[in-house]
Amino acid sequence: MDKREAIMAAQNYVNNVSKKYELAQAFIFGSYAKNNYRADSDIDVAIVLKNIPNLFDVQVDLLHLRKDEDLQIEPHPFRDTDFNRDDPFVNEILQAGFELKIAV
């Protein structure tokens, strides 16, 4: 899958997720953001959610929601209150990734 197709798949996925959850932000990060992807690379998508008490349940649900999209999508959920530059993983996403639009 090329970068344009990966971005389209990730954007469609985020649009579907936003129908079920209140999203604060969403980002593509990892190999597609850094332009070092391969044909079999996964599409890392950070999903920043509002008002989520149990991230484990959300993670499972996010994996199920991707069945209508490309299975290469690898969702990474975050609470909006935890998504800040003090976390090295979040800092990497913010520095190397790029933000996806959230459907309103």
Describe each model-derived feature in a short phrase:
Residues 46-48:
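Short hydrophobic/aromatic beta-strand micro-patches
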